[in-house]
């Protein structure tokens, strides 16, 4: 009878593993799309932070434009900043890049800024510069530290002892 109906005896795909892999890849792609949308919403918070100017400073702060920027930064700096992508997208932490003003495309220092979950007198969430590292997780230089502290002070951010 199944021959007459031209029905297959086995209703599973010919290659179940291939079908599974395609489905799993599509699920990961959807998760990545959702993460990217969350990142886009949360990255706007960092834009004003990058517009703070420190007189006479040779550095600037740059916000990542995409999650891919975190991967590129991690690769250039040989550290794990890409593993923070989900936390950044969900707004649990923020990552910025300190660059030389004359060479803003070259990685210099990666900076993590975390919300304190406290509210200041203006009703805004407060933030702490949690960590800042050069390539290979090397400590920042005194000059970079001085810039970062001035930048944080202008924004009303505190600075952790992990610098």
Where are these regions (language model features)?
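Catalytic-core elements of nucleic-acid end-processing and repair enzymes
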Residues: 1-163
């Amino acid at each position: 009878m199944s021959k007459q109906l031209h029905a297959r005896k086995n209703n599973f795909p010919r290659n179940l593993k291939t079908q599974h892999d395609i489905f799993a890849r599509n699920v990961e792609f959807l998760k990545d799309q959702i993460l990217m949308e969350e990142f886009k919403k949360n990255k706007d918070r960092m834009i004003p932070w990058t517009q703070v100017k420190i007189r006479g400073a040779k550095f600037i702060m740059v916000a990542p434009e995409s999650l891919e920027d975190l991967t590129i930064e991690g690769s250039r700096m040989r550290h794990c900043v890409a593993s923070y992508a989900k936390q950044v997208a969900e707004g649990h932490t923020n990552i910025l890049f300190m660059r030389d003003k004359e060479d803003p495309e070259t990685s210099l220092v990666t900076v993590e800024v975390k919300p304190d979950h406290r509210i200041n007198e203006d009703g805004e969430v407060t933030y702490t510069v949690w960590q800042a590292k050069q390539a290979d997780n090397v400590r920042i230089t005194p000059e970079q530290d001085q810039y970062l502290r001035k930048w944080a002070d202008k924004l009303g951010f505190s600075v952790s002892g992990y610098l």
